[in-house]
Regions:
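An amphipathic, basic-hydrophobic helix/alpha-beta surface used to engage anionic
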Residues: 36-308, 348-351, 367
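An extended acidic
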Residues: 1-64
Length: 437
């Protein structure tokens, strides 16, 4: 590819050649021919013509293997593969020149558009000596959840005279996952007494798996040796085992609306962003109380995470939430009809939605209430996001706000605990308001 310098030289040579022919000046023609010869030599033998591109994804590398661009090698390392929103990711790009000649390189590492470079730079223009290497290090700030990939590496190799260059993309990629950030609900819940609503693991005064001591009994074949009470054995001369008081674990179902309408508003401030963060925070809280948590995300399809407990369940839920995309328009009634037969009676239901463009919401939540489910609805208002971004005028806002208030009042009349979640309101505040605290 011609650079600006080579284009100017070429244009000048053409002008001198034509002028020499017109004036019959052999000196101008000779100079023009010399320039043409020099440009031809630089283009063919200037040291940049060994460019070739091939590569593999980063997870296929072994050892110090990278992706080669002729005699130039690129390798990339990330400080982590899983981070939370607003977290930082350090990227180190290693460039090597394995040839015996110096290379003038222009390197740009492609990063996702939503990422912000907080420190350093993903671009460098340098002369890399023969059999030398250099490192490009920069820090990304990751404001939004999702699956992301860094790459490819765009490289421009110039000849020593700066006349020509060739550009190629080195197909080296690194994938990473950004989880939705979570709000710590532990202290806030205790202050607002919300945990009384969601009871968590409760002792029911029956023997079984649990943490609290229940009674002593004689050892039977098959009992765990860890359960043997050696002090009781020393006193009685019989093998005795400890029985624990069985814990009853509540099932909590979290439903997230990820239809196309949930992305109404700015990219970083919309109903889906708030809903995924709330779902992550609630899942962490309930799993910390040894509850069994299940998640349902619906948009163009219904994606569910079966109820389970423990840290592994939290990771599964966070991964599903990170991959939630706003698309489709499945009605809530379809979701309720599908999951209703599989939910234990009395399970708390938490529904996260902006309540827009779905005429089945009232009937769907009525079905839950008719079966005596405890339903809590947190509804991030897309109207507020649009109005704050000045995409909605005052008159339109007031009309749509009135319609929304009527819908919320109708749901309250069904016995649904509901809160209009304003953009600057903490999750703990919104949840306490929904529960009437």
């Amino acid at each position: 590819m011609w650079s600006r310098k080579s284009a100017m030289l070429g244009s000048m040579a053409v002008a001198m050649y034509l002028l020499g022919l017109t004036l019959r000046n052999s000196q101008l023609v000779t100079i023009a021919v010399v320039i043409f010869v020099f440009l031809t030599w630089a283009a063919l033998f200037g040291g940049h013509a060994d460019v070739a591109s091939s590569g593999r994804r980063a997870e296929e590398w072994t050892g110090e293997e990278g992706v080669a661009l002729g005699s130039v090698l690129a390798m990339r390392k990330l400080s982590g593969s899983r981070i939370f929103e607003d977290g930082e990711l350090t990227v180190t790009l290693r460039m090597q020149n394995n040839s015996g000649l110096a290379k003038i390189l222009e390197v740009r590492d492609r990063v996702p558009e939503v990422m912000r470079i907080k420190e350093g730079s993903n671009y460098i223009l340098m002369e890399l000596g023969p059999r030398r290497e250099t490192y490009i290090e920069y820090t990304l700030e990751c404001p939004l959840r999702g699956f992301y990939s860094i790459g490819p590496v765009a490289v421009r190799v110039q000849d020593p005279f700066g006349l020509f260059h060739k550009e190629k993309e080195m197909h080296v990629y690194n994938d990473f996952l950004v989880f939705p950030k979570m709000e710590d609900l532990k202290d806030t819940f205790v202050k607002s007494r919300v945990p009384k609503i969601f009871t968590g693991a409760v002792n029911i005064r029956q023997p079984g798996p649990g943490s609290e001591f229940y009674s002593l009994r004689e050892y039977f074949e098959g009992d765990s040796f860890r359960a043997i009470n050696w002090s009781a054995y020393a006193r009685s001369g019989k093998l005795m085992v400890n029985e624990r008081e069985r814990d009853a674990v509540s099932d909590v179902i979290i439903i997230i609306d990820s239809r196309a309408v949930s992305e109404t508003g700015p990219v970083s401030r919309n109903a889906l962003v708030y809903s995924t963060r709330a779902a992550a925070s609630l899942a962490k809280y309930f799993l910390g109380r040894r509850d069994s948590v299940g998640v349902v995300v619906y948009g163009d399809e219904v994606v569910s995470v079966d109820r389970d407990t423990g840290k592994k369940q939290l990771y599964v839920i966070l991964t599903k939430l990170a991959g939630a995309v706003a698309r489709g328009n499945i009605p809530l009634q379809v979701v309720v009809n599908r999951i209703l037969p599989h939910i234990n009676k009395g399970s708390p239901i938490i529904f996260l939605s902006n309540l827009e463009d779905d005429p089945t919401i009232v009937n769907a939540l009525r079905d839950f209430r008719a079966r005596d489910f405890d339903v809590t609805v947190l509804t991030p208002s897309s109207l507020e996001f649009e109005f704050d971004a000045k995409r909605l005028d005052r008159t339109g806002y007031e009309v749509m706000k009135t319609e929304r208030d009527v819908l919320i009042g109708e749901l309250r009349g069904l016995g649904v605990n509901i809160m209009d979640w304003e953009p600057d309101m903490l999750l703990s505040t919104a949840l306490a308001g929904a529960r009437g605290f």
